[in-house]
Amino acid sequence: MQMKKLLPILIGLSLSGFSTLSQAENLMQVYQQARLSNPELRKSAADRDAAFEKINEARSPLLPQLGLGADYTYSNGYRDANGINSNETSASLQLTQTLFDMSKWRGLTLQEKAAGIQDVTYQTDQQTLILNTANAYFKVLNAIDVLSYTQAQKEAIYRQLDQTTQRFNVGLVAITDVQNARAQYDTVLANEVTVRNNLDNAVEELRQVTGNYYPELASLNVEHFKTDKPKAVNALLKEAENRNLSLLQARLSQDLAREQIRQAQDGHLPTLNLTPSTGISDTSYSGSKTNAAQYDDSNMGQNKIGLNFSLPLYQGGMVNSQVKQAQYNFVGASEQLESAHRSVVQTVRSSFNNINASISSINAYKQAVVSAQSSLDAMEAGYSVGTRTIVDVLDATTTLYDAKQQLANARYTYLINQLNIKYALGTLNEQDLLALNSTLGKPIPTSPESVAPETPDQDCAADGYNAHSAAPAVQPTAARANSNNGNPFRH
């Protein structure tokens, strides 16, 4: 009895858990999944860790080097007149400590600088992942909007085709009006194929970044959408000078190249090593004539300490050549820094201009949608009284939905440009994604079939016009008015 009482509770808990798992993902959740599973970011993290671990390798030659050696030798004097056999065992312990070797110290410094560059690279890859995730996410939302508007446009033109066919059947319009409406409907059908494919590709691009498919995503909350103008461009440039990661990486690379010149010049300097050691040796003899003094068994130990000094005097010009190579590399790194600086200035200014252009585009397309709707209403009213043609109505319909698509695209472009300028400044982080995440609203499906279900019956009805267009064209007006078969949309 208790199990029967618990069963509904367990089922309810399992269903509630399933609904949580199936909820629409928002931008922040998608990014967290990408951060954990993106192979490019994980590779970058591994490269950074390897670079820092290599610092320990570069430091190791400066630390004491301790070695243990052992040796055993057996000698058989079968051709020796004395017939002496011997067993010799020896062992040694040797320590080497670098007292002065500037090239090894320089190598440690170089590796520390190289690890710093790799760390900046990892930070850049983190920001790149944030930008790529947002790009892919909003690209899916934009593709969904485009498909939705294309579907709405198709429905609107279908209604116009239906109405025009009815008017043609009763002799109110010419066959050219029906043909124009049908041509526009076919154009939208062809465009629908493209936008469906674009949505599929956008979903696939998001999967490539995160490793997951998302049946639903949180959509943009258009009602609460607002725009903010960026700071003055000079203030942005000053901030980018100090924080842009590409610029920082170029500066570190120049500093590394400068240090490599010093390392090459160290090839002229001497080295000094301390080499203390201790060893023992045990020798025993056997044979018929081992009574001589030189064949007495021995057991000896020895301690040594020494200094090893080396000064390169001439190496065939190798050191001078290495110095010149390092100097040329420094020139190249300096030019790369200048190139990075120019690129940062261009990127910041372009991002600043793009944000302002996006804001202007949003405002312009808002007005364009209002104007296009008013124009369509006027064209439909004029067509109903005969002052406008069906071409005017179709053009106005296309203009309206084009404006709606452009408005949606302008909103997403603005959001991406907001991230682009943060990326150019070098300050892009998860807080920026949280800010964008707050602009999202209700969940929407991501599959084309769910966004805009296909309408085979409607398309078939539109195709049916071709089979019936010839017959009504030769019928008198009264006959067309009384015919039920002249309108393929009434099947």
Swiss-Prot record:
The membrane-topology field of this record reads: Multi-pass membrane protein
What residue spans carry the Polar residues bias annotation? 272-287, 482-491
In terms of InterPro entries, this protein maps to: Bacterial_OMF, OMP_efflux, T1SS_OMP_TolC
Show the ranges annotated as biased composition (Low complexity).
Answer: 467-481
Leader sequence segment: 1-24
Q: How does it assemble?
A: Homotrimer. Part of tripartite efflux systems, which are composed of an inner membrane transporter, a periplasmic membrane fusion protein, and an outer membrane component, TolC. The complexes form a large protein conduit and can translocate molecules across both the inner and outer membranes.
Q: What's the family? A: Belongs to the outer membrane factor (OMF) (TC 1.B.17) family.
- Identification of the protein by name: Outer membrane protein TolC
Species per Swiss-Prot/TrEMBL record: Salmonella enteritidis
